[in-house]
Every structure is written in structure tokens, then in C-alpha cells.
């Protein structure tokens, strides 16, 4: 996953600053171009997840430059991760969906289970992957309510043909429990720290 790491602000503060100035589009474009540039500079070949606002998309002229610059090298390598965000633009979503799917790339839905990204969004977006929010995962091995909710969510998502990522796995016990209930992929400090 390509993560934004601003130097003088938290990611949350940066987003708030740009949102307040109605300039989230700048972050969207910088994220796409910056993530793919870093991806190729580091010699990666596996898929890369890039965070994206559901309220924005790269404009057609920007997309043309993006596809011309990175071309077929990114076909099938990108996972566009739709962030939990209160604003959603149907027009931008239609364009983003068309553009991403035309290059055989995937969609994931981030922070599932927190309220905004829920089954309604799964029905609408039809993601290939859903990432269970860390709040569902933390200490799941000790919490019967979380276990029931997570197990049910994984079963329903699998019925939709969606792969499930457990985010924020920090202990062997969490990992082992999530394996036992069918999570497909895992992310968290137990497995690796960001580099």
C-alpha cells in the first residue's frame, strides 16, 4: 500500500487543510502520480494499493497524461482503495470506475465496519477487496462481539465474491483467529512495518 507521509502535518491535518480550501483534487492527483513514480523507482512488481477519495477523480486530461506516462506497465497492477469519506460524487465515481476497470485494475473499500463504508457501499462500488477496519480487529481474539461481527462480515463479503483484508493485525493471537474465520489477506505490525 502506498502511504502518504507529509513532513510537517499528519495525514488527517493535511486532508482537513485541503478539504477546507476545496483542493482535495490536488491530493488525489499527487497521490496517483507520486505513488506510481515511487513504485517504479523502487522496482516493485506486485500490485500497489493507492488511496483515493470517493468524491474526486483524476480529470480526463490528467488521466491521459497518467496513462501515457505509465502506460501498460501499470495494467493490472493497481488497486484503487476507496477511503472512508463522508462525501461521494456519482459523476466522479462513474469516471473513476470506467478508467480503472479499463486497465484491468482493482478496487478495494477501506475501513469497512466503521459506519460510512458498509454493505451499502459494497453493493454500490462492487469492490474486489474489502479491508476490515482496525477497530474490528484489535484484540478480536479476546472479544466475542468482535468475533461474531467479523465472522459474519467475512461470510457475507465472501458470498459477494469479495476478498477480505484484516487491517491492523498486531499480534499472533489476532492473526491466528482471523485465519481461522477465513480472512484472505492481512496487514499490520505483526507482519511488517511500513518502509
Model segments located where?
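A short, polar/charged loop-to-alpha-helix boundary motif
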Residues: 4-18
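Structured helix-beta-strand junction loops
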Residues: 21, 44-45, 76-77, 103, ...
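Catalytic core of bacterial c-di-GMP phosphodiesterases, primarily the EAL and HD-GYP domains
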Residues: 25-95, 105, 168
